[in-house]
Structures are given as C-alpha cells and as structure tokens.
Amino acid sequence: MRCILFIALIITSFSNPLSAHELTGTLQQIEKSREIRIGYRQTMPPMSFLGKDGLPVGYSIDLCAEVVREVEKILGVTVKSHYVPVTAEDRFTALEDNKIDLLCGATTKTISRGEIVDFTQLTFVTGASFMALKETKIRNNFEGKKIGVSKGTTTATALEKLLTDAEVKADIVFVKSKEDALKALDKGDIDAFAADQVVLIGMALISGHPKSYSILPDLFSYEPLALALRRNDADFRLVADRVISDLYRSKKILKIYDDWFGQFAKQRSSAFDALIQLNAIPE
C-alpha cells in the first residue's frame, strides 16, 4: 500500500512540476491575492481592444485567458482577472513597477526589450506596413508626405530607418491611439499610417468603412509578437510557455486564429504555419 501511495505521489509531482516546490514570484503573489493583473491595449484590434460590451477582447486576450486557466489549475483556486489598460509608452514600466503581471497585446519581442522585461514563446508573426485612403493612391512614394505612427513602438523605429535609408524626406507624426490615426487619415491630417499589418487590418475593420482604406502589401519590418512578463520569473514564464506550446501541439491555436483573423484572412501566412511547427515544443 505504501508503495502504491509513493508511486502516485511521484506521478502527481511530474504532472505538475511546480507543485513539487514552493511557489515564487508572480505565482506566489497571485496565490495570496487571488488576482492576476492583465495589461492590455484598448485600441489594437484584432490583438487586444474593447468589445461592444466594453470588455477587453482579442487574439492575445484569448491567449492570456488560457494562461489564467492554467494558473488556476496549478494553484487550485479561482483567480480573478483584473484588466489594466496600458499604452505603448508605459506598458513595460507597468510590468517593472509591478502594476501588471502579464502584458497581452501586440508586443514585439526584441533583444533590447529583453533587458527590461521577459517574453514568452512567440504568439504571432507580422510586419509593419502602411494604410492610407484609397483616394490618395499612395504606392510607396512618401516624399513630402505626413506619416502617422504610434510613439514608442518598434514600427516607429523601423519607419525612421526606412526613410533615412531611402533618403526620403517625410514628416513623421506621432498619434496617441489608433482611433486618432483613423480620424487623422479621414481628415487628411496625415497621408498614411504605419503599424503592424495585422493591426492595420483590424483598424480598417472597426472603422465602419473598411473599403475606404488601402493597405500596402509590402512589409518593411519583421515583427515577432509575444506576451510579456517580469524578468527573473522563470516559474511564471514556464506556465505561460507550457500553455502556448500546448495550443500549438494540439492545434487549438487554429480556433483562436480563425475567431480573430478568419473573417479577412483567406489563408494563413506560411510564417504563421511555420510558427505552429516550431513552437509545438514537447512536454
């Protein structure tokens, strides 16, 4: 009988490695508060934005919900999700200052950003492009044009490099939100807006008149997206990575993808299909 109990204990420990030792970092904090604070962008469709009922929705929000369910399973308690709106400028500071526990939006994973925050496995792959009114007929000719972009983003950095390398003289106009960008485009205050192509598609869809816009097919950057969390928190990162890997292995990620991209993506990109294969890491 003792032998059977010992074997059962070993099996339980392997099925949930984190239960085999004391909780640390964010997991310990969540166990005490029974709450996880999720940072999200309010105007980054289809990755994260406010739905018609005023609640956060989107591709990244769904991924974070899967992480929360895994945390509840590990802790054995119900965990409340508290959504905290963040901006492009303060999202990483919010993690550093312990105001949020997990950043769920359209965040590009870079080496330099890894100096201040940590990242999960990749959750999406996209690239920066331009959106303009169809009537402007912009075709990669931005000489003397006004180009809007969100400050503090990798797109802003890539845009500055693109214009410098091409020796194009254009005015960069920083906008606070995607809604402001749409208004600026419609009023003619800017000639084009630069952002991740997937974000541009989402913006067009919620504008109310998507056929008025043209999104250039060419990309001028590589944007690997991931969820972000605090540095030096290996246990919490392991939980998130385990969830993401399982979504890829089980192909459940395809259901989430179709929910948010199926209406305008006739077929998945080869880069995303490759991402599924590469991130389906064995348990």
List each model region and its residues.
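A ligand-binding cleft/hinge motif common to bilobed small-molecule-binding domains
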Residues: D90, C104-E115, A158-L163, D186-S221
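Acidic, polar ligand-binding/catalytic clefts
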Residues: A65, G76-F142, S214-P217, A280-E283
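Short beta-strand-to-loop elements that line the ligand-binding cleft
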Residues: L75-T87, V168-K178, A184
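Periplasmic-binding protein-like
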Residues: Q42, F124-A132, Q197, A204-S245, ...
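Ligand-binding clefts/hinges and TM-proximal coupling segments of bilobed small-molecule sensing domains
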Residues: H21-E22, T157-V175, K211-Y213, I244-E283
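Extended ligand-binding regions for polar small-molecule ligands
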Residues: H21, L27, G58-E70, T136, ...
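Extracytoplasmic small-molecule ligand-binding "clamshell" domains
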Residues: H21-C104
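Bilobed "Venus flytrap"/periplasmic-binding protein-like clamshell domains
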Residues: Y40-P46, P56-K73, T107-T108, T126-E179, ...
